[in-house]
Amino acid sequence: MESENILEAKQVSVAFRIAGKFQKAIYDIDLSLRRGEVLAIVGESGSGKSTFATAVMGLHNPNQTQITGSILLDEEEVIGKTGDSMASIRGSKVGMIFQNPLTALNPLMKIGQQIKEMLAVHDVYPENQYESRIFQLLEQVGIPNPKRVVNQFPHQLSGGMRQRVMIAIAIANDPDLIIADEPTTALDVTIQAQILDLILEIQKKKNAGVILITHDLGVVAEVADTVAVMYAGQLVEKASVEELFQNPKHPYTRSLLRSNPSAETVSDDLYVIPGSVPSLSEIEYDKDLFLARVPWMKEEAQKVISEKMTEISSNHFVRGQAWKKFEFPDQKLKGGKK
């Protein structure tokens, strides 16, 4: 019987070797994803979003990285797999759309050859169908004149076209999970909308699960089913998109939403979150990591320890108890999902 969850991550931690010792970049991550669900992972740069995604893909250097916990892809354990055993999963069960296609694509290989390379790694399609499959993929992602594009190099295409090629490669072998890591960052607004629509169209056709890594809360409000908020390598809140936008609890989630400009912004002054995400050497996972950034909560931060995620209402999880005491000094957050 096919499992409802395409992804189940439990107590996942990733540590990088830095100056001879391992330092945790993400810690104790629990996430699951159903088939057909869009999960958005949000947070500032340095929060650990991409580190988690590359752990799912098995892209970390095993000599410089320690990964613990469990990551099940379609009930198959990923952690511990390397080489050919991981390559058989990557591309067939999970595909990834990277942030910058110009660096992700091989500049010395023609587009058709790069898609063919992905098909050749797996046995999903026989070799005599490679050519027709390549044209089918390019047409599916909205690239005009595929016969011309297969013989072009990445630098000969626009940014939007390169990202469409990346999507074609990611879905070449019909994976059940698609990871989109900031897929529209380098594109203009019009092309951004087209790329997001394309990803969602493919997701619905295949009933695939999608992990969308982004800092754009407007995009999250439009496309996500569930939102996971990360800060300094930890999950701090997880809920349905409606619940999170209408009833945010964790101080970091509330700060992110308040710093996002909208027509409903209460004040003319744009709220700025004080400070920055701590470096790996500064992180103490037994402390509440965000409160130390909030000037009016620093005294409270010394008293509050980091705790496990707690379900405060149906499928709404929040880390620790600090949210019960946190308030902005001037006013309550107003507004919700656009």
From Swiss-Prot:
InterPro entries recorded: AAA+_ATPase, ABC_Ni/Peptide_Import, ABC_transporter-like_ATP-bd, ABC_transporter-like_CS, Oligopep_ABC_C, P-loop_NTPase
- GO terms for molecular function, please? ATP binding; ATP hydrolysis activity
Cystine bridges: none
- Which reactions is this enzyme annotated as catalysing? a [peptide](out) + ATP + H2O = a [peptide](in) + ADP + phosphate + H(+)
Question: Which SUPFAM superfamilies does UniProt cross-reference here?
Answer: P-loop containing nucleoside triphosphate hydrolases (SSF52540)
Family to which this protein belongs: Belongs to the ABC transporter superfamily.
Protein name from the UniProt record: Oligopeptide transport ATP-binding protein OppD
Source organism (scientific name): Lactococcus lactis subsp. lactis (strain IL1403) (Streptococcus lactis)
